[in-house]
């Protein structure tokens, strides 16, 4: 999985080694298996981190505009399901606050950048996403922290393996995704 892409963080962040990554995943994320890389800020304790994940969803046509209202509705539905499955209610529930910023697709980089501000009980949380399309799915960079952590997607570079680049799509052999770009956005997890 690690050979799918390379994550280059901005100054002040460090990509964990393979063994450090596995330990971090086991301790903090519960053993998910689609993570390519984990990065921590210098001196970080794990409460603020970045992860690069791979979503092999098939080719997604990028000419469908992103409707933030539809994304917002889908996120709310996902949060309702998360709260129900986790038995969270009232003051302990995970709640939507706002986009921070709203989803925006850049056709030159083939990436969507956006942020979701949440409250988990009384605690604020922020997930920033940079989702870059591939010929067979997407790479998703997720920065996890709080609004006070000063997180930014600036300076992060995601370099996919050359043969996985979006423009390498072969309509004769590559599978197409069943959903749209919006569906792919809604597959992103909240951490």
Language model segments and positions:
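N-terminal mature-domain "stem" immediately C-terminal to a signal peptide or N-terminal signal-anchor/transmembrane
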Residues: 1-11
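A short, surface-exposed beta-strand/turn
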Residues: 128-139
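N-terminal leader-region detector that preferentially activates on the first domain or presequence
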Residues: 1, 52, 132, 142-143, ...
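Surface-exposed amphipathic alpha-helical segments
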Residues: 13, 139-176
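Sec-exported extracytoplasmic/periplasmic mature domains
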Residues: 10, 80, 84, 159-163
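Conserved polar/disulfide-associated segments of primarily extracytoplasmic proteins
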Residues: 4, 15-127, 168-191
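Extracytoplasmic/secreted envelope proteins and their assembly/folding machinery
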Residues: 10, 72, 76-79, 151-155
């Amino acid at each position: 999985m690690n050979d799918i892409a390379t994550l280059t963080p901005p100054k002040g962040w460090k990509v964990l080694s393979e063994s450090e990554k596995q330990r971090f995943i086991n301790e903090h994320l519960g053993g998910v298996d689609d993570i390519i890389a984990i990065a921590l800020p210098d001196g970080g304790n794990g409460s603020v981190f970045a992860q690069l994940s791979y979503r092999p969803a098939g080719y997604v046509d990028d000419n469908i505009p992103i409707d933030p209202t539809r994304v917002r509705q889908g996120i709310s539905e996902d949060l309702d399901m998360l709260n129900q499955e986790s038995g969270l209610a009232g003051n302990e529930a995970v709640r939507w606050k706002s986009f921070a910023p709203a989803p925006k697709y850049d056709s030159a980089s083939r990436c969507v950048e956006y942020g979701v501000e949440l409250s988990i009980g009384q605690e604020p949380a922020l997930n920033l996403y940079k989702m870059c399309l591939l010929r067979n799915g997407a790479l998703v960079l997720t920065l996890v922290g709080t609004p006070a952590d000063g997180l930014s997607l600036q300076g992060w570079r995601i370099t996919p393996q050359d043969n996985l680049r979006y423009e390498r799509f072969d309509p004769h052999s590559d599978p197409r995704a069943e959903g749209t770009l919006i569906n792919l956005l809604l597959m992103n997890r909240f951490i």
